[in-house]
A protein has these predicted regions:
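Short coil/turn segments that connect the beta-strands within blades of beta-propeller domains
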Residues: 17-19, 83-85, 139-141, 199-201
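Residue-level signature of beta-propeller blades and closely related beta-rich strand-turn architectures
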Residues: 27-28, 93, 149, 159, ...
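A detector of repeated loop/turn-to-beta-strand junctions in beta-rich toroidal repeat architectures
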Residues: 44-49, 94, 150, 164, ...
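Short, conserved, GDST-rich strand-edge loop motifs in beta-rich repeat architectures
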Residues: 24-45, 100-102, 206-225
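Signature of short aromatic-glycine-proline-rich micro-motifs recurring in repeat-based ectodomains
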Residues: 7-11, 72-78, 123-137, 181-198
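Short loop/turn segments immediately following beta-strands, especially the blade-tip
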Residues: 52-58, 99-112, 155-167, 218-220, ...
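Surface-exposed loop and turn segments in beta-propeller and other repeat-based domains
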Residues: 1-7, 60-71, 107-127, 167-186, ...
Length: 239
C-alpha cells in the first residue's frame, strides 16, 4: 500500500462484473485505540479519501479526497445487483453520505445526505451524528445508517440512487436525550453496528463502538453494558 500512496485502510466493497473495488480509510491503531482526540483530525491522523481499484490489475485507478465534508470515511456499500455501478460511503466525523457511480472510467462522487451537527453545552464543538455503519437492503430499495452520538438510525428510499429520500427514523440511546426507554430501561450508548434481516423487515442494532470510545462518550456503558435492539421496518411504504 505504501507504493500506492494509501496511508490508511478500513472497509471495502467490490463488483466483479465491473472489475472494480472501493476501499476506505480510518486511522492507525495507535491513533484511535486510546480514544478520540479532535486535534488528531487537524494533524491528518484520520483518513478522508476513498480509492477505486482495478481488481484484475490490483491497482488503484482513482483516489478521491473528500475534504472537510468527508472526514473519516469508514463504511462503504454498493447495491446488491451485480450489474449495478452505484454505491455509498459514510463519512463518520463529517456525518455525510456520499454516493458514487463507477459506470464511467472517471467515477462520480457526490455528497447526497448531510446530517447537521447540533450545538450542545456538553461538547466543545457542534455535536456530529457520527455515522458508524451503513447498509443497503437486499432488494436495493433502502439505505440505512446509524448516528452513534445523536442516537438515531435512519432509513432512506434509494429507488433513485443519487437522490435518497428520508422515509424512517428511530431513536436508540444517544447523547441528545430524544430516545425513549425500551422495556423500562435506558439504553446506554447509541446505534452503532446495524444488520438487516434478509426480508428487510427487522433491523438489528447494537450500541457499543470500541471500549475506549464507549468509556469516553458513554461512561455509563461500563457498568450497564451495551444493548442489542430490533427495529421493525415497513418494506412497502418505508418507515
Amino acid at each position: 500500500l505504501k507504493d500506492m500512496d494509501i496511508q490508511y485502510s478500513y472497509d471495502f466493497w467490490y463488483q466483479p462484473r465491473k472489475n472494480m473495488m472501493v476501499s476506505t480509510e480510518w486511522a492507525a491503531p495507535k491513533t484511535f485505540q486510546p480514544g478520540f482526540e479532535l486535534d488528531d483530525v487537524g494533524k491528518d491522523k484520520y483518513g478522508r479519501r476513498i480509492h477505486f481499484w482495478d481488481l484484475d490489475k490490483k491497482e488503484v485507478k482513482k483516489t478521491f479526497d473528500l475534504g472537510e465534508e468527508g472526514l473519516i470515511p469508514l463504511e462503504t456499500r454498493m447495491l446488491h445487483n451485480p450489474d449495478s455501478s452505484h454505491g455509498y460511503v459514510g463519512a463518520t466525523l463529517s456525518s455525510n453520505i456520499f454516493h458514487y457511480n463507477t459506470e464511467r472510467a472517471d467515477p462520480e462522487v457526490k455528497k447526497v445526505i448531510d446530517v447537521a451537527s447540533i450545538e450542545v453545552d456538553f461538547f466543545p464543538v457542534p455535536l456530529p451524528g457520527l455515522i458508524t455503519d451503513i447498509l443497503v437492503s437486499m432488494d436495493d430499495k433502502y439505505l440505512y445508517f446509524a448516528n452513534w452520538l445523536h442516537g438515531d438510525v435512519r432509513q432512506y428510499d434509494i429507488s433513485e440512487p443519487s437522490n435518497p429520500k428520508l422515509t424512517g427514523q428511530a431513536w436508540i440511546g444517544g447523547l441528545l436525550g430524544k430516545a425513549p426507554e425500551i422495556n423500562g430501561k435506558k439504553i446506554e450508548g447509541g446505534p452503532q453496528m446495524i444488520q438487516l434481516s434478509l426480508d428487510g423487515k427487522r433491523l438489528y442494532v447494537t450500541t457499543s463502538l470500541f471500549s475506549t470510545w464507549d468509556n469516553q462518550f458513554y461512561p455509563g456503558m461500563k457498568d450497564e453494558g451495551g444493548a442489542m435492539v430490533v427495529v421493525d421496518c415497513d418494506t412497502e411504504n418505508g418507515g
